[in-house]
Amino acid sequence: MTTGKLLDETATLLIGKNILSVKPGKRRLTIVNGGQTGVDRAALDSAMHLMLPCRGWCPNERWAEDAAIAPNYPLQECGSPTPAVRTELNTIDSDGTLVLSRGNPQDGTPLTVERAKLHGKPTLELNLDETPDVAAFWAWISKHDIRILNIGGPRESFAPGAVYTPTRKILDLILDPTR
């Protein structure tokens, strides 16, 4: 398995019954987060769509603002009903954090950035209203040797209908190791 290793040449991976060609300078990242609506949910959906490993910690009873997090998301309950606990654990369990937001981060997003800095984890912030620089993203991943990427940002209620979709488009673009 090539997870965690930057590739110097195109490699072919067999994942289940699917064959993927991973481009040079990219790797199959593992995505972690807490499964909240908005950015978290888009990140997990993107990871599953791209056949990237994903996991994370979520509050007890799989709490999210819309309902209990569906069982198809591979998350573990963190032993606390407090979202801040899962934020802490996901930050600790990752090599770096990607934050997607608009303007000044709100909700639990500033806590995610604060926890990443506290634990010495590199953080990259992307604006949901801008087209990301894919090469710059992968250069950041390479520079910090990130294998497990925590992805966070606002809940869907922060801007109903305007968080999940742009996040999903951005992540489908930048996380795809075959592009």
Where are these regions (language model features)?
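Acidic/glycine-enriched connector segments
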Residues: 6-148, 153-177
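Extreme N-terminal basic, low-complexity initiation segments
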Residues: 2-4
